[in-house]
Structure formats: C-alpha cells, structure tokens
C-alpha cells in the first residue's frame, strides 16, 4: 500500500482532466492505496481550499493575483513548484503522479523526490502541435514537447492514454509504460436492438471542429436529398451554427437535428438511441496522442463508431466489426460509409453493437488495470 500524491492542473471530476485522474485514483484506491490530489493554478485567484469528494482529499491552490507572476509561472513553474515541495513535505507521499506537466517541472520534481525515496510517474494524455498562431498556446506546447522528448524517460513509470504515446515511449527507452485509455464507470450488458427503417447517427463535438463537421453534414444532406434515410443527431452545436455551415434553413427536412450544448446525461440518452456514433479527427499528432472519451463512451454504451483512420485511438476500431473506418473524412468518403451502413440489416448492426460492448469490456473497465497500476506505485526507487 502506498500514499499517492496526484499533481496537476485539474479540479473535481467535472472536466475531462478531472474525470481522468479521478478514475485512475479509484483504481488505485481499489488496490488499497491512499490517493491525495494537489490541484494547481485553480481559476479563483488567490484562494486555496481543501475539500473531500467521494472519499478523496483535494488540495486546491488558486492562481496568483499577480498577472506577472502567473506569466512567470507559465515559463518556469516557480510558484507551482514551491507549492509542490511544501505539499510533499507535509503529506509525505511514497509516490507522485504528475498529470500532463507543462511547466518544465519534471526535472525539478524528480531531483527533489528521488533523494527522499519517492518515486515519480506521469499520467500523459496529450501531445500538442507546435502552432505559432497563438503565443501562449505555443509556449505551453513547446514546454510539453520538451518534457516528452527530454525528461519523461527519467521517470519511474508512465501512464499513457493511447497506443501512439505508448509506442513512442517504448521506442525511446522509457521504463514501465502502462497504457490506460479513458475508464468508464459502466459498460452496458445489453444492447438496444436496432429498429427497422431509418438509421440514426449521432455526432457529439464542439463548434470549433466545424472543418471536420461540415463534410459530414454535406454527406447527410446529399444522402437525404429525395427522402430522409438517415437521421443525424448533432450534440454540442446549435441549429444556428449548423444552418450557417450548410447555408440551409430547414435542417429537419435534411434529417439533421441539432441539440446545442446539453447536460452530459442528456447527451448519453441521445447516443444510446443511435445506430452509430461519429468521430472524425485531423491527421495530426494531437489526435494520435490523445484518446477521445466520446469513442470509449460510445463503445461502452454499445454503439459502434464511424471514424476516420489517423493512427490514434481509432486503432481499436476494426472495420465491419465494432465500427466503420474510412481513410479520409471528406464528404464523398463519408457518404460512401453511410451508404454501407444503409445496406446493413438489423442483425448485422446488432452484431456490431455487441462487439462494441465486448471491446469496451476489454479496454475501459477500471479493474483491468488494478494490478499493473498497484505494482507501479508500490515499486521502490
């Protein structure tokens, strides 16, 4: 049994980052370990708090009230490192897990912890592109890139979210790489049988991905040109945004239903009604290194996925087995994929739904990772 200090720029399990570390912590707790969260640079300036959530202790550290100090922290992490040192001295952990460190702190943390007999691991879920379009994004991306290429090999263990990151770390001599995709609280035991008639597809995404959404919308509009054969539920994008993208007024006539932003519970209900969910990613490093929670959630709900191949999380989708995989995500390629779906009978789709749940049970259940995580946090430096 070890005392684990989970450090990162996250909060309670209300965001993707918060949910990720919370799920990992639950697996560690199941193995008998004690997990404490140190949540850095919280948005409430100057305020610090300690709270209990589901039996976990959260230490919340607010940002500095000084903008200059916050900028300085982005470049060198001085303020955060002081907080980290104080917390380590107070809590006396056996091991530390750092979530997506982005302030060039890894070397400092290792140097501080190893002489004290504390092991250091990382939970890595992203690897940004180096884009100069936004200065601060570039600074963060550069820091992350430096850390992954230069510092992570010195860690005692790495928790990787994707096959892409795992392959990178293993090929660069990193020791003890553990691949853990997004963990789901529940995998459906029974599928919803496919209804006869019109097929239902669901897309849940952000308006910022409009360049990926537009070809899909065009494919839906074209395939429903004479009559509605496919209903496309769009979650996360408003009717006005879809109308602007497609330059049409009557979305329902084209089989498109836009929900806008909805609570997660409502989003799940929409996904559960679908025959396939939609996931299109750019063929860029960030997409390969990350792992879409929407993909794991869809499979856990027994819904196969129509996705494009980018060499990331899509590697767990086998074409015709637990989803449909296409090479491009242009409107022509998407339309051909939808036409394939329309040719499938209800029994074939039900089989793919069953395979989706089987994939989820083999990948996204926390207990699958209990022993390997427990070994990592309990090994000696």
Question: What is the predicted role of each segment?
Answer:
Residues 39, 121, 129, 149-190, ...:
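Donor nucleotide-sugar binding/catalytic pocket of nucleotide-sugar-dependent glycosyltransferases
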Residues 1-46, 50-56, 157, 181, ...:
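N-terminal subdomain of nucleotide-sugar transferases
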Residues 243-268:
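Nucleotide-activated donor-binding/catalytic signature segment of Leloir-type glycosyltransferases, i.e.
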Residues 5, 159, 192-220, 233:
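Conserved donor-binding/catalytic core segment of Leloir-type glycosyltransferases
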Residues 15, 211, 265-270, 277-296, ...:
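Nucleotide-sugar-dependent
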Residues 346-377:
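A charged, aromatic-enriched C-terminal amphipathic alpha-helix characteristic of glycosyltransferases
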Residues 319-320, 324-331, 340-346:
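Conserved acidic donor-binding segment of nucleotide-sugar-dependent glycosyltransferases
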Residues 23, 81-86, 104-107, 111, ...:
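Membrane-proximal helix-turn-helix segments that form the acceptor-binding/catalytic region
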